[in-house]
């Protein structure tokens, strides 16, 4: 029973209950310390963006990540698509929560994705993935810069061959060390 499961912070049957679910949709707001209690359920942990990709198959996705400039870039992409008469929705860390979007067939969904969301992603496969920049940020949450970088690069690692990775030219050293299936545009 979902209502009773999270009524208080000290649920005795939490482990038993979590063993009986397929997925745990983790809020990006949960701190690293709190997540340690869930580490044994790591394979079941997904994000709201993963849930979107699992439940909606008929949309084009554009996912934007980076330390700075995500919101502005998402708004610009959305504006350009709308100007060209495409059906566009925007969500994630910007505006409407991603799971509240009313996605229609053949829509473009522009998603602002944080490193927190990407760190646990397993099913996100954006048609177009943008990495704007990476600077020292959120290291308290990720533990170190390498973990932070890897969380950002995860969107490319999950892409397929027919999808596109768009990466800031200043980050090409990072990308040379990785083998992505998607088409890389620098």
What spans do the regions from the language model cover?
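Phosphate-binding loop of NTP-binding sites
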Residues: 17-21, 28-169, 173-181
């Amino acid at each position: 029973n979902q209502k009773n499961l999270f009524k208080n912070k000290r649920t005795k049957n939490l482990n038993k209950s979590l063993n009986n679910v397929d997925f745990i949709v983790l809020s990006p707001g949960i701190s690293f310390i709190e997540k340690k209690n869930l580490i044994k359920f790591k394979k079941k942990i997904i994000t709201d963006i993963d849930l979107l990709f699992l439940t909606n198959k008929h949309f084009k996705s554009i996912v934007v990540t980076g330390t700075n400039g995500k919101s502005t870039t998402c708004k610009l992409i959305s504006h350009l698509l709308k100007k060209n008469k495409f059906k566009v929705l925007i969500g994630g860390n910007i505006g409407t929560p991603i799971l509240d979007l009313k996605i229609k067939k053949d829509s473009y969904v522009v998603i602002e994705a944080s490193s927190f969301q990407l760190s646990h992603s397993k099913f996100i496969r954006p048609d177009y993935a943008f990495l704007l920049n990476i600077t020292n940020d959120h290291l308290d949450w990720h533990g170190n810069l390498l973990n932070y970088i890897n969380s950002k690069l995860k969107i490319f690692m999950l892409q397929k061959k027919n999808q596109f990775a768009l990466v800031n030219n200043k980050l090409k050293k990072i990308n040379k060390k990785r083998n992505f299936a998607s088409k890389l545009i620098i």
